Amino acid sequence: MSSKRDYYEVLGVSKDATDDQIKSAFRKKAMQYHPDRNKEPDAEEKFKEVNQAYEVLSDPDKRANYDRFGHEGVDGQFGGGAGFDPFDIFNQFFGGGRGGGAHFEQSFGGSGFEDIFSNFFGGGRRGASSQQREANLVVSIVLTFVESVVGVKKTIEYKIEKDCESCHGSGADNSEGSISTCSNCNGSGVEITQKRTIMGIIQSQNICSRCNGEGKEIHKKCNSCKGRKVHEERVEIDVEIPGGVSNDEHLKVSGKGSVVGGKTGDLYINIQIKPSKIFSRKGNDIYVILKVDPILAIVGGEANIPTPFGIKSIKMKPGTRNGEIITVPSHGVKSTKRFGSNGDLFAVVEYTSAKRFSSAELKSLSKFAQETNDEIEKYLKEARKEIN
């Protein structure tokens, strides 16, 4: 990007936006442009731009300077300098995951990834930290609503990267002189720049522009991997998805990521849940429509309620009303939190159209229809008051 955009425009908020509105906008934009989710060529640049905007607008002092002086008032103030690490901000923002489920070291709620990306990028220089970023993988799977509630075993197929065996992950040919210490940063991976602003001279630490923070320069690429340092490999694993997961939750499977720089990364499974035509979820509670014949509702009897665990038969009391809610305890979503409570299932009674009756049956029913209904009489009494 040739010039910096207005930070409020970047996050899509107004200049009088509240802290909560800024946080909400950042969450949405950061997830949209994260390079491990968005493969567009400019995704990483947009991700950095979003994080820069949030670092300024979420800090009262920086925001005040920005509102007064524009970009010049905050340039060089980013944590780590102009070459600041946007993933540090991302990780600080998306914290607070919860303890895991079966076969998973850790799971993370839809509100954030916690340490999914904390290992992806380090601050200042790349080197081992960028290797860790490449080693960790995110794979999305789709579950039905019922699978998300009761749990399911899934086979996941995905690609990993492994260190090139020829160059051992260096990307350089094995011949002498094919790789050397970076002449620009002397192997540190960073370079120091100074910028004069209206607030004085600000010194910044940036990722080395020559070696991109690696500290090494490759003069002759490896013939096997063509300088990529890794080879791709397709793998397949079976995982037990625990019951109770939420949409956009992330489950961590340790040691199932790529192998880069001699380090094995982790696999993060992104859960996507298909909407149900029968059930809806609020927290750990499940809601379902209970179709009931009006005659059965009047006289009472057995009714069948769909639950994620199967059809459950219940005894309906006589005079059950349309819209009445019947609670089925412990048939909701199982809590995956240590001190959380399991949910219940709430069945909302919905009358169906009455079935067809024979002439004899209608004659018998008509006797009951002619009897006085107190609710109707009360309604008509109120109506007569308004009419007269």
UniProtKB/Swiss-Prot annotation:
Primary location recorded for the protein, binned into one broad class = cytoplasm
How are cofactors bound according to the entry's free-text note? Binds 2 Zn(2+) ions per monomer.
Location within or outside the cell: Cytoplasm
Concerning Pfam families, the annotation shows: DnaJ (PF00226), DnaJ_C (PF01556), DnaJ_CXXCXGXG (PF00684)
**Under the cellular component aspect of Gene Ontology, which terms does the record hold?**
cytoplasm
Q: Which UniProt keywords are present, listed alphabetically?
A: Chaperone, Cytoplasm, DNA replication, Metal-binding, Repeat, Stress response, Zinc, Zinc-finger
Molecular functions (GO terms): ATP binding; heat shock protein binding; unfolded protein binding; zinc ion binding
Report residues binding Zn(2+) 1.
164, 167, 222, 225
Start and end residues, zinc fingers (CR-type):
151-234
Cofactor(s) the protein needs: Zn(2+)
CXXCXGXG motif repeat extents = 164-171, 182-189, 208-215, 222-229
Per the record's keyword annotation, is Glycoprotein included, yes or no?
A: no
Q: Which family does it belong to?
A: Belongs to the DnaJ family.
Q: What is known of its domains?
A: The J domain is necessary and sufficient to stimulate DnaK ATPase activity. Zinc center 1 plays an important role in the autonomous, DnaK-independent chaperone activity of DnaJ. Zinc center 2 is essential for interaction with DnaK and for DnaJ activity.
Q: Give the protein's biological function.
A: Participates actively in the response to hyperosmotic and heat shock by preventing the aggregation of stress-denatured proteins and by disaggregating proteins, also in an autonomous, DnaK-independent fashion. Unfolded proteins bind initially to DnaJ; upon interaction with the DnaJ-bound protein, DnaK hydrolyzes its bound ATP, resulting in the formation of a stable complex. GrpE releases ADP from DnaK; ATP binding to DnaK triggers the release of the substrate protein, thus completing the reaction cycle.
Q: What protein is this chain from?
A: Chaperone protein DnaJ
